[in-house]
Amino acid sequence: MQKSLLAVLVAAGIGTTASAQKPTATAPKSYSAAGKQVQVYTTADNSQLRLSATDKLSFKEVGQPLETQPTVFVDPTHTFQTLVGIGAALTDASAETFAKLPKAQQQEFLQAYFSPSQGIGYTLGRTNINSCDFSSDTYTYVQDGDKELKTFSLKHDEKYKMPFIKQATAAAGGKLTLYVSPWSPPAWMKDTKNMLQGGKLLPEFRQSWADYYVKFIKAYEKAGIPVWGLTVQNEPMAKQKWESCIFTAEEERDFVKGFLGPTLKKGGLSDKKLIGWDHNRDLAFQRAATLFDDPEASKYFWGLGYHWYETWTGSGMQFDNLRRVHETYPDKHLVFTEGCVENFKFDNVQDWKLGERYGNSMINDFNAGTVAWTDWNILLDETGGPNHVGNFCYAPVIGDTRSGKLIYTNAYYYIGHFSKFVRPGARRIATASSRDVLQTTAFLNPDGKVAVVVMNQTDKEQPFQLWLKGQAAQATSRPHSIMTMVVN
């Protein structure tokens, strides 16, 4: 990308859309689109359109829609879950790449992601406890064998990760909803004596490991980084070549019920949102049933986290499993905790399918009841790393440390069609499409604006009408495009 992203967004008029937010949107008893305008923002393949203000539409009163009229129906009087936020993981790899960029590009990056007016307004973050694959080395915060955690120190994180998180928080207006996840306990706490290649937490170290979470959260907060929540274990059913640890559903339930939950409570951290599973959609229902059907375990869990990598088995994305969880446990919250496109190749950073995978997932995940959506690495370098086991992947923004430039993939813009226009406190509202080529979701923001996202993954343009309570506005979805239609 040759031109500064900020200049592109301002030129498109996007810098004028931010407004003061109320805590939570309230469903209106009635709604009329009469007299309202629709500002359309578009990102489309084979064009220069990237979150560009493209059309301004008006509503007209219409009668019964016909089957021959492609229509996106929206009803703001029917509301569902409340959005916590949209964002990404601030990993060691992201922090190290950020530190290698020139100061001007660092500031561009921070505004591009975290400014709601000049960027795409991220409000959510995730970071790792101990090392993960997207670290340059394997590390923990204690010396080997220190069961009482007397040697606990954040010295490793103080070099890159913590300053990075603090700058991101400042760029987000001083508030970032941050949650934390471990990939593995220290090697000496495991049956394999290895942080990599799976293995299990030894029973005699369950209390020490529970204490470890509390130590980490309190140390981060003492250092000026508030922590909103935590997951129990990243990908607990995967034996990976990187940091990993296996927990069956019963083992996770019993660890939380007997150790982690009570330890958080004893440590004064009961307000932290505890999220179970943190793995793929395929086994999500079975995990939820095991964790939430036990009242002594369930009382500690705020929600269930999930990833999108179930496709490694040859399956498609299993969104219906999320619906089963939401239907069965409506008091628990669904959180998308990780997703990226793997097998990085620099020549493919502008592959349009990158963005479409995000758009497809986000629309379906939100429609299934998801309250928070977290991309994987927020920034990676020109190799798709750094990564200490060679597991390179794509990030929406690539920091080319050779040239010092930022490369914005179309995934950045696709995510921005949600994060920029659907703000924390927004309520998902009823929406339906009369054509399967038009995927859609919609939200009512705290400021009263309605944001409707419409995506077209086909090679053909699709005219349609946006229909709200007997009022319709005429629009066209371009081939391989995503639109956000802001009704005000």
Where are these regions (language model features)?
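Bacterial Sec-dependent N-terminal signal peptides
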Residues: M1-P28
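N-terminal catalytic cores of secreted or lumenal carbohydrate-active enzymes
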Residues: L51-V227, T248, G258
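Alpha-helical scaffolding within the catalytic cores
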Residues: P65-D75, M162-F164, K215, G258-F259, ...
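Conserved, mostly hydrophobic/aromatic
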Residues: A88, G121, L178, L230, ...
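Active-site neighborhood of glycoside hydrolase catalytic domains
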Residues: S208-V227, P236-E342
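Aromatic/acidic polysaccharide-binding cleft in carbohydrate-active enzymes
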Residues: H333-Y414, A430-S433
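Carbohydrate-binding surface patches
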Residues: K420, T431-K469, H480
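C-terminal beta-strand-rich structural cap/linker in extracellular carbohydrate-active enzymes
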Residues: T476-N488
